């Protein structure tokens, strides 16, 4: 099945990263890690959309959708991951500037991915996490850790109104 196939590949990839002690050293490592932890979710969703609604999407954009969301999480949790888990998902030599650029590049792919979604329920399902990711990135650019509760609530209302 679609879900079994995606979760099997994800489990294999995560096992590989666990054996590597979650050490991300290069952009290629980051791409590989984010593919297994989030890009595959985008691929799985795309396969489900095609199966259930006949909606076809671009695989690379689906991966970008997942990667973009994960890159925002990496940025948001960077210090906590380091302090509490002793792990950094940031490639060697990268500053937050490069990590922001990585997130923005993948969120741009996610925005393009959204254009392939033609069924309202599917669009809503994907649009809210993406809108929250964009606004969280903006909040972090402004020096805040996260969005306020009021901003989250307003974003939910905005997405539902579309």
PLM regions and their residue ranges:
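Catalytic cores of Mg2+-dependent Asp-rich isoprenoid enzymes
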Residues: 1-69, 75-162
């Amino acid at each position: 099945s679609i879900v079994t196939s995606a979760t099997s590949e994800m489990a294999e990839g995560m096992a590989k990263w666990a054996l590597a002690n979650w050490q991300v050293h290069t952009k290629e490592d980051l791409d590989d890690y984010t593919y297994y932890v989030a890009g595959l979710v985008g691929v799985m969703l795309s396969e489900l959309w095609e199966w259930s609604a006949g909606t076809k999407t671009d695989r690379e954009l689906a991966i970008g959708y997942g990667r973009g969301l994960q890159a925002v999480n990496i940025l948001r949790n960077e210090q906590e991951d380091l302090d509490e888990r002793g792990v950094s998902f940031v490639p060697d030599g990268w500053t937050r500037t490069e990590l922001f650029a990585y997130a923005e590049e993948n969120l741009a792919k996610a925005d393009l991915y959204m254009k392939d979604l033609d069924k309202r329920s599917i669009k809503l399902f994907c649009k809210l996490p993406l809108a929250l990711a964009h606004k969280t990135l903006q909040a972090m650019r402004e020096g805040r850790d996260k969005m306020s509760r009021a901003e989250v609530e307003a974003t939910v209302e905005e997405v539902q109104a579309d």
